[in-house]
C-alpha cells in the first residue's frame, strides 16, 4: 500500500506555521493616559428586581437572562489630558447578552454636543476603556461599539428623581426607592462594584429607548444611582 506523502506545509517548523497564519482582526487597545471624572451615574435596565449584578459583582445572571440598559453620566468635574470635561453629559445604550462579567457588551455612546473636539475624543477613549484606569475593563467587556455621536444630552437631577433625554432616542426617568426613613433612600454601601461603593436603589418611571434597531421600555424595572469618582491609571 502506497504511503500518502504529507504536504510540505505540514512539515514546516511550528514557529513558521504560526508566523504564516492570518493576523488577528483589529481590536481596541488600551493606551493609558491621564484623566479623571467626578459626578453621578444613573441607569435603568431590564431587570425585574434590583439588579443582581451589583451585589454579585457581575457574576449572577440578570433576572431576564440578558441586560438591556441606558446609562447617564453627569460629569460635575473632570478632565482628559488637560482638557476640561466639567459640566458635560454622556448617555450610553448598553446591551449585555448574559452575565455582566462574561462580556459581549454592545454599546452606543451619545456625547454632549457642547464638548470640544478633544473632549469628545477623550470621552470616547474613557468609555471605550482605551484610556485605562477605572473604565479600562471595558476593553475586555465591550465587544462592539455600535455607534458614537454628538447629541443634545439633557440630564435632570431633582430631589429623588433623575432623567435622561436624548431627543426621541432615549427618554428615561427614574425615582429613588424610599427607605424606612423618608429622608434616606434604600441603598447598598461599601460594595466593591466597579461603578462605586455606594449604590442607591431606584425604579424606572417613563423609560424608553428607540435607536439602533432597539425598542426597549424599562418602566417599573430596576434602576440605580451612583456617585462616581473615576480616574486614569496611577503614574
Segments from the language model and where they lie:
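Charged linear interaction tracts used for macromolecular binding and regulation
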Residues: 105-184, 189
Amino acid at each position: 500500500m502506497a504511503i500518502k506523502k504529507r504536504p510540505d506545509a505540514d512539515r514546516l517548523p511550528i514557529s513558521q506555521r504560526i508566523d504564516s497564519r492570518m493576523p488577528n482582526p483589529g481590536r481596541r487597545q488600551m493606551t493609558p493616559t491621564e484623566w479623571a471624572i467626578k459626578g453621578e451615574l444613573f441607569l435603568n435596565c431590564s431587570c425585574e428586581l434590583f439588579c443582581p449584578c451589583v451585589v454579585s459583582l457581575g457574576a449572577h445572571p440578570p433576572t431576564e437572562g440578558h441586560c438591556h440598559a441606558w446609562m447617564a453620566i453627569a460629569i460635575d468635574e473632570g478632565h482628559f489630558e488637560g482638557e476640561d470635561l466639567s459640566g458635560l453629559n454622556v448617555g450610553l445604550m448598553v446591551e449585555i447578552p448574559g452575565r455582566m462579567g462574561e462580556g459581549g457588551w454592545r454599546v452606543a455612546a451619545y456625547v454632549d454636543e457642547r464638548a470640544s473636539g478633544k473632549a469628545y475624543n477623550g470621552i470616547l477613549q474613557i468609555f471605550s476603556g482605551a484610556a485605562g484606569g477605572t473604565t479600562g475593563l471595558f476593553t475586555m467587556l465591550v465587544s462592539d461599539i455600535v455607534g458614537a455621536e454628538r447629541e443634545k444630552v439633557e440630564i435632570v437631577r431633582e430631589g429623588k428623581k433623575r432623567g435622561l433625554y436624548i431627543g426621541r432616542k432615549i427618554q428615561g426617568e427614574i425615582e429613588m426607592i424610599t427607605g424606612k426613613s423618608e429622608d434616606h433612600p434604600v441603598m447598598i454601601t461599601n460594595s466593591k462594584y466597579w461603578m462605586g461603593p455606594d449604590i442607591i436603589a431606584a425604579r424606572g418611571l417613563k423609560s424608553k429607548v428607540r435607536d439602533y434597531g432597539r425598542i426597549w421600555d424599562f418602566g417599573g424595572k430596576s434602576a440605580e444611582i451612583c456617585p462616581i469618582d473615576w480616574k486614569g491609571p496611577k503614574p
